[in-house]
Amino acid sequence: MTIIDTYKTITSTSIGEFKDKGSKFIAYATPLSMEGDFPLFLEKIKKEHPKARHHCFAWRLGMDGNSYRANDDGEPSGTAGRPILGQIDSFGLTNVGVVVVRYFGGTLLGTSGLIAAYKESTAEAFRQAEIIDKIIEDIFEIKFEYDKMPDVMNALKRLTINILSQNFNESGIIKISIRQSESEQTILHFRALVLKKSIEETQMLLRSLEDALASGAWQEGVFISKL
């Protein structure tokens, strides 16, 4: 089974503007890591635009995109939040939030005009953004006795595993990150190198990565846990 471990998002806050019949729409798009990030961003935009008539928004989170919200903030139902969310989806993004502030120009735009304005301002913010494919990584912690340090460090180097942190007190503790789709095989190869056994022999000791992590302790003075 193929593991999908990338998603499209933006790297930093970007801005898009749209004007129609005197009304001005300013869209602010920002990357999100969790739902709790968005209220802070929304409050920041509100403080920057206290005289705006509306602060409409939408966000989507997660690999499956099942976590989302859209809000019209007083605009006619379905004319603001949904068009904003629609552009998030049209650009194929997730872990993204957008706030669009509207300054009323004195002329009503009607339902179709509002939908077009919120859609276009959001699209412009995304056109101004740097869109990237972000890789999802698994984080592991390796604990080991000092006599295993040469084997552990050699295995990490040979497999070019990314080291996040190192701590050497009573024992060695190293945190590493591995691309999610490659983590099971990489950990298997790491174990084989440290054990000085073949992949086949190592597989006989460890039926699967999940079994190994669930059981906790591992032989040969090395302990690996998934964080």
Model segments located where?
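C-terminal regulatory domains involved in ligand/effector binding and gene-expression control
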Residues: M1-T79, S165, S183, A192-S198, ...
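N-terminal positively charged helical leader segments and presequences
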Residues: N169-G172
